[in-house]
């Protein structure tokens, strides 16, 4: 019955087409994979979520708050900040969404003809919080200077840094000896500079 209606031939054609399609798909996938693997690791990492270093000592050194009116720009810059922190060796957590600030204004449509009709305006400020852990102040300042240099338009930043000092810090600063003869006020600085100029040989030539 199968040979009479030609079902065996149809089955053969279907299997041949399927195997050819599979080979073509495998070849295309291999070519795309070769091109994908040829990318540098730094570019390859952009297709994945940013990596994070584990927090070991739980020493909070800074809080970075990002603000913007657009969620897309805010999330993009938060992603960029996480990648910068990873390559600088800073353990970071976040971004944590903070409550959205909503502001509304009601104004008249026009000063004369439409003075009795009102118009409402609303603005939403979205926020994200990033926390930096287990890093020294120099690395944190480098991180902040880099993201400030490459900041995005429309995204604001606010950073709170935390440094731990001893209880006797004021006493230790008071005990630091000052340089002998160092001027302490602006007038003393100017006077010392004038005295230095008057003693110079170039100035004495004109006297």
UniProtKB/Swiss-Prot annotation:
GO terms for molecular function: structural constituent of ribosome. It comes from the Eukaryota. It is found in: Mitochondrion. Involved in mitochondrial genome encoded proteins translation. Involved in the binding of tRNA to the ribosomes. Disulfide bonds: none annotated. Residues 1-24 form a transit peptide. The keyword S-adenosyl-L-methionine does not apply. NCBIfam families: rpsJ_bact. Pfam families: Ribosomal_S10 (PF00338). HAMAP family: Ribosomal_uS10 (MF_00508). One of its GO terms (cellular component) is mitochondrial small ribosomal subunit. This is Small ribosomal subunit protein uS10m. Belongs to the universal ribosomal protein uS10 family. It comes from Eremothecium gossypii (strain ATCC 10895 / CBS 109.51 / FGSC 9923 / NRRL Y-1056) (Yeast). Keywords: Mitochondrion, Ribonucleoprotein, Ribosomal protein, Transit peptide. One of its GO terms (biological process) is translation. Part of the mitochondrial small ribosomal subunit. The keyword Zinc does not apply. Its main location: mitochondrion.
